Amino acid sequence: MAGRAGSDERYVLDLCDEVFGIPAVRQERFDWLRGDPSPTRPRGTTLPVDGYWPDLGVVVEFQEEQHSTPVPFFDRRQTVSGVGRGEQRRRYDARKRVLVPEHGLRLVVIEKSAFTVSSRRIVRDRTRDIAVVRGCLETD
């Protein structure tokens, strides 16, 4: 797996920065967007969003395979919610789809499957990929 600097998420968010002309706040957390409670965190932990452009009121979530395809090794692990990681991920994605717009922000979800992928990584083609990103940002 690539480090965060070379990750597909970083690459796609960098393309979003280019389209918008300003950099995102990466891994921003909001007090109103929280995970499930646990014994040590009764209010739940704040959940990060991948990219946030405060001046534009836009949040971008980049969704890789694990958001739509089960990953048995990781998904079976129980979480503080008492459910597997895959189910928890689905719950948190749904929570973001509801709460982000409720708080006056526009949520754009960019699926990894929108890009050309080889060996589970985006095949970097800047011209093609920026067109994909631009299309997602303009239609969502």
Where in this protein do the model-derived segments appear?
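Nucleic-acid endo/exonuclease domains
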Residues: 1-140
